[in-house]
């Protein structure tokens, strides 16, 4: 049966990637269908109840700057907020929030239900309709056919999902949900490179059986941060603490004695797990010299008694999980509500994608999220937004757009995936970005909101707030440049009290603010020097831009040099064997990766600057030098 209505964009999967993809396409005016196996689980947090962190918080701010839902949802559902690296420079500061699972999911579902141009339908997708290497729609499990020229697959861990608890295993997309077997088989028929990855989750614990007095309490920050550029602290629900405890030698002995019962060490699991979120059994083996490992005891919600013990993800048998948990301080009498488990699933080599996240082999088909080898809600949400946006642009007959590495962390993420691929679940860190000083959390809106408005992603309310903020920044920058202090000024004593050496000549507030010992708020607290503006986010931008002006200019110069050839296109059917001077090894790597641009080619392991020069010379001789949009 063919559904009576044609769509512009179909999104398959309602997790963090799928919801952002569907919302983005709908905001751009596309008639959009979100297809999910269960409408009740839209926006569900399948693993840890938290959003943000180092690198991840930057992605959330970028999603927000482009009009996405994640930041506003966590502002409404966050029960503890912290700024990580707060004592370090602004480039690596990151926001993290503990979430109430129910409140977060409700916020996402409300956003979906109120979005114009978006319809939701509950059915699993079993097949893709592909004609002449072009996707034209999908087929559901009951044979219902939906038509659309753009399809975005955001299927998480559901493709061929296999859940492991000890040496027992069963098919599942996550605990309590069936896997997607038919779609996994269909995708394996298409010309994509496919492999398996693994992720895991810890057992959940009943808070009523835990002795918190034996643990270290961890409170949130005051004042409470917000994630969204449109957010305010009053959006937050009640704030509650987390707790910290540790494993010990008894815990480690239990694990070592039972490693033979682990599916990872028993050879049952073949998929590679996340390097930066290893299971507790993996930690004990890899870090055998450590006598304890930290566990963050995280509440799952204001109305839930379940706890998430972050740090003891495991797939050991349930009886061993009980021993592990009850060996830990504070958990001696703990009751496990849900067992921990590992899940293996299919992912597809992201080098088979264009930077738009459209597949290279099937026109109009886009992938986003864990299907591309990433791990994490934030990585998924960022990809989903870009894929949904580019799926919409495809329908509109417009050029795709993906931010460059110097424009956004999502640009770094997508460039890494599509250029280098991944052999393990990919997680974002600030260390992955070359231009961290420019890619801060605090300026994500300045970097991306204008482009989002141009693309149709940013609504009038956000656009007005952005313009008001930019006006404050411009006026305050001019004010501190035009306000001068001389050594006979009435408040000179107050100014000198802030300085390491007294002022001996006239200086503007801008010059004073560039001194490392001077903070903007301290300077503004002096009578007669304070600003008329109250927008703290805007005033923070004034301080950062003034203090780091020299570094920012130098980094921008580096970017401008890099961009000379970054966007130079390598033709789709380019024959690298015809380029004289390229080694067989370089040719093989270029053929395997099929980079879209010179910039991508330069980041492939083993591709030397000399090889890049040879490519540029050849392109120039052949009259093929041109830049992408």
UniProtKB/Swiss-Prot annotation:
SMART domains: GIDA_assoc_3. FAD binds at residues 13-18. The keyword Ribonucleoprotein does not apply. One of its GO terms (cellular component) is cytosol. InterPro entries: FAD/NAD-bd_sf, GIDA_C_N, MnmG, MnmG-rel, MnmG-rel_CS, MnmG_C, MnmG_C_subdom, MnmG_C_subdom_sf. Keywords: Cytoplasm, FAD, Flavoprotein, NAD, tRNA processing. NAD(+) binds at residues 273-287. Gene3D superfamilies: FAD/NAD(P)-binding domain (3.50.50.60), GidA associated domain, C-terminal subdomain (1.10.150.570), tRNA uridine 5-carboxymethylaminomethyl modification enzyme MnmG/GidA (1.10.10.1800). The keyword Ribonucleoprotein does not apply. Its main location: cytoplasm. It comes from the Bacteria. GO terms for biological process: tRNA methylation; tRNA wobble uridine modification. GO terms for molecular function: flavin adenine dinucleotide binding. Its cofactor is FAD. It is found in: Cytoplasm. NCBIfam families: mnmG_gidA. NAD-binding protein involved in the addition of a carboxymethylaminomethyl (cmnm) group at the wobble position (U34) of certain tRNAs, forming tRNA-cmnm(5)s(2)U34. PANTHER family: GLUCOSE INHIBITED DIVISION PROTEIN A (PTHR11806), PROTEIN MTO1 HOMOLOG, MITOCHONDRIAL (PTHR11806:SF0). Homodimer. Heterotetramer of two MnmE and two MnmG subunits. Belongs to the MnmG family. This is tRNA uridine 5-carboxymethylaminomethyl modification enzyme MnmG. It comes from Pseudoalteromonas translucida (strain TAC 125).
């Amino acid at each position: 049966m063919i559904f009576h209505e044609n769509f512009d964009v179909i999104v398959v999967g309602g997790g963090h990637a799928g919801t952002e993809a569907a919302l983005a396409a709908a905001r751009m005016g596309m008639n959009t269908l979100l297809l999910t196996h269960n409408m009740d689980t839209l926006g569900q947090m399948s693993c840890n109840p938290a959003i943000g962190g180092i690198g991840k918080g930057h992605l959330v701010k970028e999603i927000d700057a482009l009009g996405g839902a994640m930041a506003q949802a966590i502002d409404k559902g966050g029960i503890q907020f912290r700024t990580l690296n707060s004592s370090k420079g602004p480039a690596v500061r990151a926001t993290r929030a503990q979430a109430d699972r129910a409140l977060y999911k409700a916020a996402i579902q409300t956003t979906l239900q109120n979005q114009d141009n978006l319809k939701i339908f509950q059915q699993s997708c079993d097949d893709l309709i592909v004609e002449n290497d072009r996707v034209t729609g999908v087929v559901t499990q009951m044979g219902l056919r939906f038509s659309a020229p753009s399809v975005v697959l955001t299927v998480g861990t559901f493709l061929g999902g296999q859940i492991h608890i000890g040496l027992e295993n069963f098919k599942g997309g996550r605990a309590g949900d069936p896997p997607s077997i038919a779609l996994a088989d269909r995708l394996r028929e298409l010309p994509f490179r496919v492999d398996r990855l693994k992720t895991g989750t810890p057992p959940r614990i009943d808070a009523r059986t835990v002795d918190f007095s034996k643990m270290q309490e961890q409170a949130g920050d005051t004042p409470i941060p917000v994630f969204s550029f449109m957010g305010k602290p009053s959006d937050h629900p009640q704030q509650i603490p987390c707790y910290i405890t540790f494993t010990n030698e008894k815990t480690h002995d239990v694990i070592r004695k039972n490693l033979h019962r682990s599916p990872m060490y028993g050879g049952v699991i073949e998929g590679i797990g996340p390097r930066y979120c290893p299971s507790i059994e993996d930690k004990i083996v890899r870090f055998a010299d450590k006598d304890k490992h930290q566990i963050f005891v995280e509440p799952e919600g204001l109305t839930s008694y379940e706890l998430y013990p972050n740090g003891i993800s495991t797939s050991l048998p349930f009886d061993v999980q009980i021993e592990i948990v009850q060996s830990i301080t504070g958990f001696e009498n703990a009751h496990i509500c849900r067992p921990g488990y590992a899940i293996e699933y299919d992912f597809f080599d992201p080098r088979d994608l264009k930077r738009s996240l459209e597949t290279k082999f099937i026109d109009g088909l886009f992938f986003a999220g864990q299907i591309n080898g990433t791990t994490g809600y934030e990585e998924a949400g960022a990809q989903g937004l870009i894929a949904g946006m580019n799926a919409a642009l495809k329908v509109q007959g417009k050029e795709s757009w993906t931010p460059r590495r110097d424009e956004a962390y999502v640009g770094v993420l997508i460039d890494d995936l599509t250029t280098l691929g991944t052999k393990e679940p990919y997680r974002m860190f600030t260390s992955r970005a070359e231009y961290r000083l420019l890619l801060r959390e605090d300026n994500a809106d300045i970097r991306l909101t204008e482009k989002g408005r141009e693309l149709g992603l940013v609504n009038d309310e956000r656009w007005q707030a952005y313009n008001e903020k930019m006006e404050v920044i411009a006026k305050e920058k001019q004010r501190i440049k035009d306000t001068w202090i001389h050594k006979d000024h009435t408040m000179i004593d107050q100014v000198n009290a802030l300085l390491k050496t007294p002022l001996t000549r006239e200086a503007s507030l801008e010059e004073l603010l560039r001194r490392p010992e001077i903070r903007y708020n301290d300077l503004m607290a002096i009578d007669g020097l304070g600003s008329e503006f109250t927008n703290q986010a805007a005033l923070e931008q004034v301080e950062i831009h003034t203090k780091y002006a020299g570094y920012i200019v130098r980094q921008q110069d580096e970017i401008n040099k890099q961009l000379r050839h970054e966007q130079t296109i390598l033709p789709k059917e380019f024959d690298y064997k015809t380029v004289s001077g390229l080694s067989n090894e370089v040719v093989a790597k270029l053929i395997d990766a099929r980079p879209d641009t010179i910039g991508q080619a330069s980041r492939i392991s083993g591709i030397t600057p000399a090889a890049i020069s040879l490519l540029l010379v050849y392109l120039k001789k052949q009259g093929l030098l041109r830049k992408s949009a």
